[in-house]
Amino acid sequence: MSETAPAAPAAPAPAEKTPIKKKARKAAGGAKRKASGPPVSELITKAVAASKERSGVSLAALKKALAAAGYDVEKNNSRIKLGLKSLVSKGTLVQTKGTGASGSFKLNKKAASGEAKPKAKKAGAAKAKKPAGAAKKPKKATGTATPKKSTKKTPKKAKKPAAAAGAKKAKSPKKAKATKAKKAPKSPAKARAVKPKAAKPKTSKPKAAKPKKTAAKKK
């Protein structure tokens, strides 16, 4: 009895695993079938755009166009009606006749042109952004070049005043030598001017002879 007891619960385990795999396969297969075809809204817009009727396309004409494209109309009748209502609410389709899904529908030209314009604007904005990025690159080059120029100029300016100071110092001893040379010859010139002043008493001798002439006249 001890040998047969553990064998009984091991048998139902594989039976439980099999239905889980089947369910997973069914879900994957259903998802693939739904994703394979385009959505109903796209098929409706294409059918309405292809029609040349001015008053719009009726629901019956839409179903015929969808059936010709290979869409199962009988199974997806409710989806067609919901797709028409959503397209009218968005503004892609305009309902010219009737109410709800039972009526005639036409493409909204304003909505179609409005969808095309934003795409063109986005493309233009992307083109405008590219030259702005290219213009930033030369700015970086100029920023790096400016400090190099400043470092080169500063030592040159410092050297010039040093050279000018050296030139001034060299000129100043020349002036001192010139002043010393000029002052030395002035002293003999003053001595020469003093000597003629001592000869003035010689001129006083002829003045003393004047009274002699007057004495002769009295005789």
Swiss-Prot record:
One of its GO terms (molecular function) is DNA binding. This is Histone H1.4. It is found in: Nucleus; Chromosome. The modification N-acetylserine is found at residue 2. One of its GO terms (biological process) is negative regulation of transcription by RNA polymerase II. The modification N6-succinyllysine is found at residue 34. Residues 1-15 have a biased composition (Low complexity). The modification Citrulline is found at residue 54. Histone H1 protein binds to linker DNA between nucleosomes forming the macromolecular structure known as the chromatin fiber. Histones H1 are necessary for the condensation of nucleosome chains into higher-order structured fibers. Also acts as a regulator of individual gene transcription through chromatin remodeling, nucleosome spacing and DNA methylation. The lineage of its organism: Eukaryota, Metazoa, Chordata, Craniata, Vertebrata.
